[in-house]
Structures are given as structure tokens and as C-alpha cells.
Design a protein with these regions (language model features):
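Short hydrophobic beta-strand element within catalytic cores of glycosyltransferases
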Residues: 218, 222-226
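Nucleotide-sugar-dependent
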Residues: 196-212, 225-237
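Donor nucleotide-sugar binding/catalytic pocket of nucleotide-sugar-dependent glycosyltransferases
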Residues: 84, 89-91, 103-135
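A charged, aromatic-enriched C-terminal amphipathic alpha-helix characteristic of glycosyltransferases
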Residues: 264-296
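Short alpha-helical segment that forms part of, or immediately flanks, the ligand-binding pocket
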Residues: 184, 211-218
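Extended catalytic core of nucleotide-activated donor transferases of GT-like folds
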Residues: 16, 32-104, 109
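Conserved catalytic-core segment of nucleotide-activated headgroup transferases in glycan assembly
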Residues: 126-181
């Protein structure tokens, strides 16, 4: 079976992580996007032009339109199964219209909030692997970080207001846009990473952990984030979850306060367990196997 992946903009380098996941288990995969990412990822999907799409995907049996980019269906082989891979804002704002463009028996969703919007949803979290070693926090002050890709939608103003004067830790944050590699370095300098605190976007439910939270977890950071409308979907799909989900400001305060009460050796153990959890559930191989279990079930 030959699998195709296609999108216009590969937000958060998500499609590339799925490409790597399929390649990790030996699946024949075609993966392109229309333009380079503004975050300057060291590695990302190759770029294609629209006139080349039909030929490039002519041999694909199943094609995932990542980020709900339904517009490319017209260029794809009629015999192929075309699946919506719903990942974010585009689907959130126009899910009914986008659903009408796909006839595949499943929808792959990257966010739990989409489980009530998508026909026959199959949940798949992005894949992240990291060579960064877990930092030992014994005998030193805990560092809490926040480096949003988009402060306006990550709840940065509220996060900074809440954590600026937090006790028993050092809070560091920046809204400066840097390269992806530089951002990973900033995150690695933290022990606890606060990804987001925002329950709505454009009047729609919002607030589900993203790639940055997973990148932090893959380094062994303790991550505080959100999973609005999860309703047990993560645990049902993957089992134990090592992310710390909060619903609101009070939840953020309580979770951080609870974590900071522990001694350094306990926190180091939690960080090691978080990295092991990522390697088990969200490595390239694990993600590729889960995706193919969905596709093979068609």
C-alpha cells in the first residue's frame, strides 16, 4: 500500500512528523507541501507546485489531506481514498463544510475537541523524538517556562499574570519569534513548561495540547497544558497520560503549586517518566503503527 500526505502550509511541522512515522515502519510514502515553514525547521516536507500534484500522487492508494486541505482533492487520482486529517483552526471554524468534501469512512483528528465534530473520528497525536537528556533538578531552583508560537491564542497574557510572581520557582518567558532550533534550546533550559491557557478561539472551543507541549515532554519536561473536551479520549486511545491538563486559571495555580511542593529527586523521576512515556506512545514508530491500524481497518 502506498500512502500520500499533502498540505499547503504544514503547521507545526505536523505532516512531516507523520511522514517520518510512516517511514519508520517501512511504509511507501509520498509527502509534499506547497511552501516552506516560517519557523525554519531544520527538516520539513519537500515543496511541490500544483501542476506536479497529479503525477506525484498517481500511485497512492490512500491520501491524507493534512490540516483539512480539501482544495487539493480535484488534483488527486479518483480511485484513491482521500482522508481528512483535521489538526486545527481551519477545521474548527468550518468543520461542517469540510466534512462535506470528504467521503472516506474515517476522519483522523489530532485534537480531542474534534471528536464530536468529525464523522467516525480516529485520534492520532503527533510524533516527536528527542535526543535531549533529562536534566537533574536536585538541589536547585525550579525553572518554569513559556515560549508561545502565537501569544494571542495561547493565553500568554493570563499565564504571565499568574506566574510572574509565583513562589518557589523562577519564571522565564519570551514572545520573541526565533528559529525552531533556538526555541527548543529555550524549552530545554526549563524544568516545567506551561504550553497554553485558552479555552476558546474565535468563539469556538479551543485549548488542546499541541506539538510544542509534546516537544517539551520528549525532552523530559513536566508539561502543563490543556485538553478541552477530551472526555477521556486520550486515555481510551493511548492509556496513561503524563501531561498535566488544566481547565482554567485556578487549575494552573493548583497544579503548579502542587508540583513545586515536591523535592528535586521526585521531579527528576517525573521528568524521566515523561520522556519514557513519549518514547512509548509518541515515537515515530509508535505513531506510524497506530496510523496504519486505522488505515488497514478501512
Amino acid at each position: 500500500m502506498k500512502i500520500g500526505l499533502l498540505c499547503s502550509d504544514d503547521w507545526a511541522n505536523f505532516q512531516y512528523s507523520i511522514q517520518k512515522s510512516l517511514e519508520a515502519i517501512g511504509v511507501d510514502c509520498v509527502s509534499y507541501k506547497l511552501q516552506r515553514h516560517l519557523f525554519s525547521y531544520d527538516n520539513q516536507c519537500d515543496v511541490i507546485t500544483v501542476p506536479r500534484i497529479s503525477e506525484a500522487y498517481s500511485g497512492c492508494d490512500v491520501i491524507l489531506l493534512c490540516h483539512s486541505d480539501w482544495e487539493f482533492i480535484q488534483y488527486l487520482p479518483e480511485k484513491s481514498i482521500k482522508i481528512n486529517f483535521a489538526t486545527g483552526t481551519k477545521y474548527r471554524q468550518s468543520y461542517e463544510f469540510i466534512n462535506s468534501k470528504f467521503s472516506a469512512p474515517i476522519t483522523i483528528i489530532a485534537l480531542p475537541e474534534f471528536q464530536t465534530l468529525a464523522p467516525n473520528p480516529k485520534y492520532l497525536v503527533g510524533a516527536i523524538e528527542s535526543d535531549w537528556a533529562v536534566k537533574d533538578v536536585v538541589g536547585r531552583r525550579i525553572r518554569v517556562g513559556h515560549f508561545p508560537s502565537n501569544p494571542d491564542v495561547k493565553g500568554t497574557e493570563d499565564i504571565v499574570r499568574i506566574l510572574r510572581n509565583a513562589e518557589n520557582c523562577e519564571f522565564i518567558y519570551s514572545t520573541e519569534r526565533v528559529s525552531h532550533a533556538e526555541n527548543l534550546k529555550r524549552i530545554y533550559d526549563c524544568d516545567i513548561y506551561v504550553e497554553m491557557l485558552a479555552s476558546t478561539q474565535g468563539g469556538k472551543p479551543y485549548g488542546s495540547f499541541g506539538i510544542t507541549g509534546l516537544e517539551a515532554a520528549a525532552m523530559g519536561k513536566i508539561v502543563i497544558t490543556q485538553a478541552i473536551n477530551d472526555n477521556g479520549l486520550y486515555n481510551d486511545t493511548y492509556g496513561v497520560n503524563m501531561l498535566n491538563f488544566v481547565k482554567d486559571e485556578l487549575g494552573l495555580k493548583k497544579t503548579l503549586s502542587s508540583l513545586l511542593q515536591y523535592k528535586g529527586d521526585y521531579l527528576t523521576g517525573q521528568m524521566e517518566s515523561t520522556k519514557e512515556w513519549m518514547e512509548k506512545n509518541h515515537s515515530y514508530k509508535a505513531t506510524g503503527l497506530k496510523l496504519m491500524s486505522y488505515i488497514n481497518g478501512l
